[in-house]
């Protein structure tokens, strides 16, 4: 059973289920070299993802467009904050080159927040989708966008380019937003996801939250209900891991049994797909999950 009690993680040793092997393989090195040669950023490195070794060894990577400097300063995130670089107009082409050379069946594109841009970078997302469609027409495309706060209908620019999956992470429960995600608004994120689904119901919508930040079980279940009300198809739940001493503390380490509980409840609430485990991240096994999403939708139609 899942407990509401938050056990402090101060001075706690990271449990065995959160330990991963250091990245080291020929495939990992070749993926790393290609990404560097094309001058692309990845959230895998910038956000210090624990799954980088496994994913890059399989030639899977989540590309981060619009630079590596974010205009927000979320308490959980390892991406640098400051004044962003100018938008690189050649980046969509280089990204399409990487997708083609890696032979990707599924690509995930994310970005830093770009509050300095009039559309938050939405048109750049759309260009990336268009270039990939032209050069790798069989590759499925998943976007993980910012919230486009105060950028009127910027999400629609991305949705019109017709990604296969539109992901926007809710990140945490409403009561922790001021502490964890102060530059964002919970209901703005919910509305974005719902508007995408209303605009084009064929686009799979996806969102994720981190646990272990101080939330209660009841709050997590309420987020599930809110996301289902917004017609979100796919939910991911993973353990928050503190990137450095300057980031927000881990409240507790959530056990694998608790993740199983959350997954079971989420499925009962009607999500087409649920991925809930300590090491789950938004784009972890994204290609496999996309294929399963398509199968689940077909089963529901039949």
Swiss-Prot record:
Cofactor comment text: Binds 2 [4Fe-4S] clusters per subunit. One cluster is coordinated with 3 cysteines and an exchangeable S-adenosyl-L-methionine.
Residues bound to [4Fe-4S] cluster 2: 70, 74, 77
Subcellular location: Cytoplasm
Organism: Orientia tsutsugamushi (strain Boryong) (Rickettsia tsutsugamushi)
Record's protein name: Lipoyl synthase
Biological pathway: Protein modification; protein lipoylation via endogenous pathway; protein N(6)-(lipoyl)lysine from octanoyl-[acyl-carrier-protein]: step 2/2
EC number(s) given by UniProt: 2.8.1.8
Span of domain Radical SAM core: 56-272
GO molecular function annotations of the record: 4 iron, 4 sulfur cluster binding; lipoate synthase activity; metal ion binding
Family the UniProt entry places it in: Belongs to the radical SAM superfamily. Lipoyl synthase family.
Positions with a binding annotation for [4Fe-4S] cluster 1: 44, 49, 55, 283
Class of this enzyme: transferase
Cited CDD domains: Radical_SAM (cd01335)
Gene3D superfamilies for this protein: Aldolase class I (3.20.20.70)
Superkingdom to which the source organism belongs: Bacteria
InterPro entries: Aldolase_TIM, Elp3/MiaA/NifB-like_rSAM, Lipoyl_synth, rSAM
Pfam families: Radical_SAM
Chief site of localization: cytoplasm
TM regions (residue ranges): none
């Amino acid at each position: 059973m899942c407990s509401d009690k938050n056990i402090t993680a101060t001075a706690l040793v990271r449990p065995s289920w959160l330990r991963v092997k250091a990245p080291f393989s020929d495939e990992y090195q070749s993926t790393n070299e290609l990404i560097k040669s094309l001058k692309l950023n990845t959230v895998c490195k910038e956000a210090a993802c624990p799954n980088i070794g496994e994913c890059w060894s399989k030639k899977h990577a989540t590309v981060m467009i619009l630079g590596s400097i974010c205009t927000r300063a979320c308490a959980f995130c390892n991406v640098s904050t400051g004044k962003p670089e100018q938008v690189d107009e050649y980046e969509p082409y280089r990204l399409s080159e990487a997708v083609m050379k890696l032979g990707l069946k599924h690509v995930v594109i994310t970005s830093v927040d770009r509050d300095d841009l009039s559309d938050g970078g939405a048109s750049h997302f759309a260009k990336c989708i268009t270039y990939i469609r032209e050069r790798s027409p069989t590759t499925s495309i998943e976007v993980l966008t910012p919230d486009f706060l105060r950028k009127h209908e910027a999400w629609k620019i991305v949705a019109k380019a017709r990604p296969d999956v539109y992901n926007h992470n809710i990140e945490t429960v409403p009561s922790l937003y001021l502490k964890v995600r102060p530059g964002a608004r919970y209901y703005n994120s919910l509305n974005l996801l719902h508007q995408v689904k209303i605009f084009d119901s064929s686009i799979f919508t996806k969102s994720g939250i981190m646990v272990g930040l101080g939330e209660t079980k009841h709050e997590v279940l309420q987020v599930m209900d809110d996301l289902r009300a917004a017609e979100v198809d796919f939910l991911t739940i993973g353990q928050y891991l503190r990137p450095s001493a300057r980031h927000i503390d881990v409240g507790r380490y959530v056990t694998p049994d608790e993740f199983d509980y959350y997954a079971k409840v989420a499925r009962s609430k009607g999500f087409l797909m649920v991925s809930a485990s300590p090491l789950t991240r938004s784009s972890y096994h994204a290609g496999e999950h996309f294929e399963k999403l398509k199968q689940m939708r077909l089963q529901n139609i039949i």
